[in-house]
């Protein structure tokens, strides 16, 4: 689960981190009133969506009048913002963040992730702030400095000082950086973060550190013990099909191809997508129905897959380990009849009662193509999607 920038900054403020005074507004009038409350003669207005690249897409603007703020809010509220991190539809803008302006002398980067290789929370800092950290990692990895947090001892001030020296901070800034580092590390642990970024962490013209942006990703598996964070969830930013699938405990991710995929097991699902690509096809989705693939869940999975108008054929790839393939076959038949599937369906069954499952499909009288292997399944579904 992701948080909006204004939500991230509210958490930063709770931990004593320096952030701009700002207000998240639902209407243009609220945005104008927020500017009056903040004071000054320049403000920054930002569209609140779960995506980066807002500035390049016109979703961030420095304004010098309340008329500009009103025009910006009226232009964006209720519309979708398309960036390089969204799909072609973009993300809906329901709130505008109005903030005071900050005079910037230098931009830094500070972030943290759960690193699977070290099995630790790892902080990353760089002098190359304001740009994608992935670009820095690819071209100048030596400019990224790290600190690994030991879960037994927690964050240590010396780690902050070490990063601060590498960033070239002066003694006053070092104290500020240490406070920011310790606050973020404690926040990361307290609220079960999966990702945290301040990009940029700026040095103002007065020489102080300031959190100019904020990005937070939460470990979804920990939301049961984070009621406050869970309440911050904005369902408007979720893909509607993915949200619907989650209600039926289906793991679905929409893609941009034309071959629908229904598989039991995440690893097998990724392998299925790979082999479809290998044979010239493009998967329309990732969908893992899990170990308990009942008729009801299979039917719902078909509905979700076919809600994508780009889908021209469906590949069902099931390995019968926990579940029997003959039961899965009956579920597929029932689902196809219930949903009224109009596109070709290719089914590959392996494992417990696989042969019996194929017989059930063959006797169904439905236009279901039974594949003999994974390679055969991929070849058949790609041909079917191409209308061959």
Curated annotation (Swiss-Prot):
Its EC number is 6.2.1.5. Binds 1 Mg(2+) ion per subunit. Coiled coil: none annotated. Pathway: Carbohydrate metabolism; tricarboxylic acid cycle; succinate from succinyl-CoA (ligase route): step 1/1. Substrate binds at residues 264, 321-323. GO terms for biological process: succinyl-CoA metabolic process; tricarboxylic acid cycle. The keyword Nucleotidyltransferase does not apply. InterPro entries: ATP-grasp (IPR011761), ATP-grasp_succ-CoA_synth-type (IPR013650), ATP_grasp_subdomain_1 (IPR013815), Succ-CoA_synthase_bsu_CS (IPR017866), SUCC_ACL_C (IPR005811), Succ_CoA_ligase-like_bsu (IPR005809), Succinyl-CoA_synth-like (IPR016102). ATP binds at residues 46, 53-55, 99, 102, 107. One of its GO terms (cellular component) is cytosol. GO terms for molecular function: ATP binding; magnesium ion binding; succinate-CoA ligase (ADP-forming) activity; succinate-CoA ligase (GDP-forming) activity. Keywords: ATP-binding, Ligase, Magnesium, Metal-binding, Nucleotide-binding, Tricarboxylic acid cycle. It catalyses: succinate + ATP + CoA = succinyl-CoA + ADP + phosphate; GTP + succinate + CoA = succinyl-CoA + GDP + phosphate. Mg(2+) binds at residues 199, 213. Residues 9-244 form the ATP-grasp domain. The keyword Metal-binding applies. Its cofactor is Mg(2+). It is an enzyme of class 6 (ligase). Heterotetramer of two alpha and two beta subunits. Belongs to the succinate/malate CoA ligase beta subunit family. HAMAP family: Succ_CoA_beta. Succinyl-CoA synthetase functions in the citric acid cycle (TCA), coupling the hydrolysis of succinyl-CoA to the synthesis of either ATP or GTP and thus represents the only step of substrate-level phosphorylation in the TCA. The beta subunit provides nucleotide specificity of the enzyme and binds the substrate succinate, while the binding sites for coenzyme A and phosphate are found in the alpha subunit. This is Succinate--CoA ligase [ADP-forming] subunit beta. The gene is sucC.
């Amino acid at each position: 689960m992701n948080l909006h920038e204004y939500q991230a900054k509210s958490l930063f403020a709770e931990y004593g981190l320096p952030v701009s005074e700002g207000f998240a507004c639902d209407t243009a009038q609220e945005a104008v009133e927020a500017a009056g409350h903040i004071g000054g003669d320049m403000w920054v207005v930002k569209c609140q969506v779960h995506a980066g690249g807002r500035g390049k897409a016109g979703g961030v603007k420095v304004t010098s009048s309340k008329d500009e703020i009103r025009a910006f809010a009226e232009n964006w509220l209720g519309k979708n913002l398309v960036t390089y991190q969204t799909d072609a539809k973009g993300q809906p803008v329901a709130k505008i963040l109005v903030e005071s302006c900050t005079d910037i002398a230098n931009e830094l980067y500070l972030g943290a992730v759960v690193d699977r290789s070290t099995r630790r929370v790892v902080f990353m800092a760089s002098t190359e702030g304001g740009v994608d950290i992935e670009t820095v990692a690819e071209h100048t990895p030596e400019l990224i400095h790290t600190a690994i947090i030991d879960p037994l001892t927690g964050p240590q001030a010396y780690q902050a000082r070490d990063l601060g020296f590498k960033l070239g901070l002066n003694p006053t800034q070092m104290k500020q950086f240490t406070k920011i580092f310790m606050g973020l590390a404690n926040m990361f642990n307290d609220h079960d973060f999966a990702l945290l970024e301040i990009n940029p962490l700026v040095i103002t013209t007065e020489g102080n550190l300031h959190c100019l942006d904020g990005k937070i990703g939460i470990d979804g598996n920990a939301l049961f013990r984070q009621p406050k964070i869970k309440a911050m969830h904005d369902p408007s930013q979720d893909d509607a099909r993915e949200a619907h699938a989650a209600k039926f405990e289906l793991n679905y991710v929409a893609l941009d191809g034309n071959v629908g995929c229904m598989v039991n097991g995440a690893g097998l699902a990724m392998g299925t997508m790979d082999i479809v690509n290998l044979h010239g096809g493009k998967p329309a989705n990732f969908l893992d129905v899990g170990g308990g693939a009942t008729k009801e869940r299979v039917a719902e999975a078909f509905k979700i897959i076919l809600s994508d108008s780009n889908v021209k054929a469906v590949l069902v790839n099931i390995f019968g380990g926990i579940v029997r393939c003959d039961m899965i076959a009956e579920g597929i038949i029932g689902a196809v009849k219930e949903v009224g599937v109009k596109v070709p369906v290719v089914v590959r069954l392996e494992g417990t009662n696989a042969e019996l499952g194929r017989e059930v499909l063959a006797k169904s009288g439905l236009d279901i193509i039974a594949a003999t292997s994974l390679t055969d399944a991929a070849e058949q579904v790609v041909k079917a999607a191409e209308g061959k």
